[in-house]
Amino acid sequence: MSGRGFTVKKNWDNPREHAMPEGVRVPAEMRIGPVSITPATVLAPMAGVTDTVFRRFIRHASLFSSDQLSVVSDQEKASEIDAEVTNSQSGCGLLMTEFTSADGLSRMRESKRKRYLTFYDDEHPIAAQIFGSNPETLAEAARIVQDTGFDLIDLNLGCPAKRVVGCNGGSGLLRDLPKIGEIFRAVRKAVTIPFTVKFRLGWNDAQIICVELARMAEAEGLNAVALHARTREQGYTGQARWEWIAAVKQAVGIPVVGNGDIRTPEDAAAMIAQTGCDAVMIGRAAPSNPWIFRQIAQYTATGSYERPTAEDRHRLIRTYFQMLLDEAEASQSLPKDARMGETAGKMKQFASWFTHGVPGGAKLRASIYQARTGAEVLAQVDGFFSALDSGDSSAETEEEAIYRESALVCD
C-alpha cells in the first residue's frame, strides 16, 4: 500500500497474554503548565481524522457501550455532559486538532477559520496544532489559537508528508535547528497559554537530534514535548524506537509524551515502564478502536479490560455517523449539498475502521460504499446489525481484514 496507508496487525480484540509490568501505571495526571491532563493519555493530531466530531466521539466513546446504557439515558436528558465524569469514563485526557497551516490561519477570513478551529465546551482540555516555517507567521497563528480559547498550542515538527516537508514544515524543519529555535522564541513570546511541540527522532538515522531539540525546547520556555520515536525517513514503517523517548525523558525536566506503536493497553503500560515518560499519545489505533483510552484506564486500574460487543459496535458506528450528520446540518462553512456530500464520504472512510471484528464486516462496508447519502448509510448500518442479531452473517476473511487494515490514515 502506498501513500498514507499502512498495514499493521491489531491486537485489541485478542490482547497479549502477559501481566502488566509490575508497579507500572499510566499516570493518573500530567500537568502542562497550569493545565491538568487527567488521565495522562493524549489523542494524537491526525490529518483528515481529528476534527471536532471525532474528538467529541472519542471523549464520549465509553457511553456507547451496552453496560453504559443507563448513563446514556440520563445524560441525554441533560443539556451537556459533565466533563470530569466523561474524562474518567473515556480515559482520554487531552484532545488535539488536525494540524493546521499557520499561513492559512493568518490569511483566511474569520468565517473560514471556524472550519478548522471549531471546538465545543466538552472538548476541554484541547490543544490546537499548527505547522509552518516562518516564525512571525507561526506567532500570529498562535495568537489566533489563544484568542479562540484553546488550552494549549502545539507545533508540528513531525509530519513526514512530502507536500508539508517541501514547504520546510513538519519534519522538514528537523534539518534546521537554528530555525526551530527562532520559531520557539517567536511563538513563546506571542502567547501565554502552554506551548508544546511534537517531533520525530530526526531526519534519518545519521541525523538523530531529538535529545538536542528537547533541551532547546525546555530552554526556550516550552511546557512539554511529544516524541514520535521514528525518523522522517522511516515514515510509519519499522518499529518505534522507544529507547529515544527514555533518552529525552532523562535529558529534560518538562513533561515528555511518548508516541509510536501503542495499539493496546499492554503497549501503553510497556511504554511507561521502558521509558518513564509522563503520558502516552495514541494516533492510528484510535479510529479502529475508539475504546482504547477507556481500556487503558481499565487496565491500569484492574489489570484487565473489556472488549466491545457487536451491540456496542452498532451503537458506536451509528452514533458517530449521526454526529457527522448533525454537525453538517449545523455548520455554515460550506453550502449544504457540499457539507452532506463530505459527510457521506467521511462515513465511508470510517466504515472500514469501525467494523474491525464484526462478523460479515465486509458486507456492511460494501453496502455503505454504495450508499449515496448519509441517511442511506445509517439505514444500511441498522439493517446490517438487525440481520446480525438474527444470525444472518458471514465471518470476515483474512484477505478482507488485510485490505481494511491497509486503509488506515497515518498520524
Residue ranges with predicted function:
Residues 80, 84, 136-169, 177-254:
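Alpha/beta enzyme core
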Residues 46-48, 100-102, 131-133, 158-160, ...:
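Active-site beta-loop-alpha junctions enriched in small/polar residues
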Residues 21-22, 26-31, 46-67, 74-144:
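Glycine-rich, positively charged N-terminal anion/phosphate-binding segment
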Residues 59-63, 144-147, 272-274, 297:
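Short, solvent-exposed amphipathic alpha-helical segments in soluble enzyme
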